[in-house]
């Protein structure tokens, strides 16, 4: 079902040395390293703040040295999913706080080594819209992927606190996701393969970044049978096992935006009573002002229309859900509560035929994105209020 991806050869090799005191050789290598990285950053369209933050991250990273299990102090668990457990950890030698993802896999040493090799491509992924990567290693049956810690967590966690995420905030999210996907495609010929709210991370500085993208074909194959859940963000063509491309990432982004906007996974679609409970007033659909329609197909047994709030019905069985995605009309935003630009943007993402679905270039130039780029939105302030985080002393409006 998953297409084998051609391995991406890294354009730049990063082998940080352990800082054990001043050494002309190591210092010279480190400086040459940073000069090389700065040249890479100059190729990107960055503002001054983004450039300084990336340079600061890379300077810190150059001092980290080889990552080893014994050097980590576990602080807390950040989340768990199909891929494994993510913990907040302190790297003792450097003092840096990192997010450490532990993936337990029963695999042969040769496969394990290939995964670690393929993950090294992440060293090359330096963008304001991609979560920073410190390194990966294997220890005691687990692969550890060490990343930049994002103190706002993922958007699925933010949604639990916010209940619904406002359109102006989602405008900034859309810009960051599009720029992140474009960076992966243009600079590294990588598809994300797993765009969803839990893989969009945010922080109190107002940054929005993608994580968990598919750089390792071997890791994807090794985890292919580990899916357990009640929802899917995969496009219809991917579920049908046909050829898929970055257009599939566009579908996943559109589905994620609908979920974040209405407050719950949008399949099956919410009925009028659910929407009224969520938005606090009747929600209409269409130009003629009719109440928002329910699913065009009779609901499966045990899933009656319910007026007891969002997501109150039993979840669909996974086979029902996948059948719905492939055979039923795609989700859409209700009218009357979102701008026509936002509705149209999402509709273009959720066209079932990938050949007709909007591509990255079209979406980047869409009226919704152009309007969002021009809006002064205090994303950092909104996030800190929502999650009750302490805002940095030098707050930013948004890092997008």
From Swiss-Prot:
Modified residues (Phosphothreonine): 394, 396
Enzyme superclass (EC): transferase
Main location: cytoplasm
Annotated positions for site Cleavage: 10-11
GO biological process, one term: heart development
EC annotation from Swiss-Prot or TrEMBL: 2.7.12.2
Annotated spans, Disordered: 282-310
Record domain Protein kinase: where: 72-369
Tissue specificity as recorded in UniProt: Expressed abundantly in the adult brain and muscle.
Membrane topology: Peripheral membrane protein
Binding site for ATP: 78-86, 101
Keywords: Acetylation, ATP-binding, Cytoplasm, Kinase, Magnesium, Membrane, Metal-binding, Nucleotide-binding, Phosphoprotein, Serine/threonine-protein kinase, Transferase, Tyrosine-protein kinase
Residue numbers carrying Phosphoserine: 23, 222, 226, 293, 295, 306
Protein role: Catalyzes the concomitant phosphorylation of a threonine and a tyrosine residue in a Thr-Glu-Tyr sequence located in MAP kinases. Activates the ERK1 and ERK2 MAP kinases. Activates BRAF in a KSR1 or KSR2-dependent manner; by binding to KSR1 or KSR2 releases the inhibitory intramolecular interaction between KSR1 or KSR2 protein kinase and N-terminal domains which promotes KSR1 or KSR2-BRAF dimerization and BRAF activation.
Assembly description: Interacts with MORG1. Interacts with SGK1. Interacts with KSR1. Interacts with KSR1 and BRAF; the interaction with KSR1 mediates KSR1-BRAF dimerization. Interacts with GLS.
Protein name: Dual specificity mitogen-activated protein kinase kinase 2
Record organism: Rattus norvegicus
Gene giving rise to this polypeptide: Map2k2
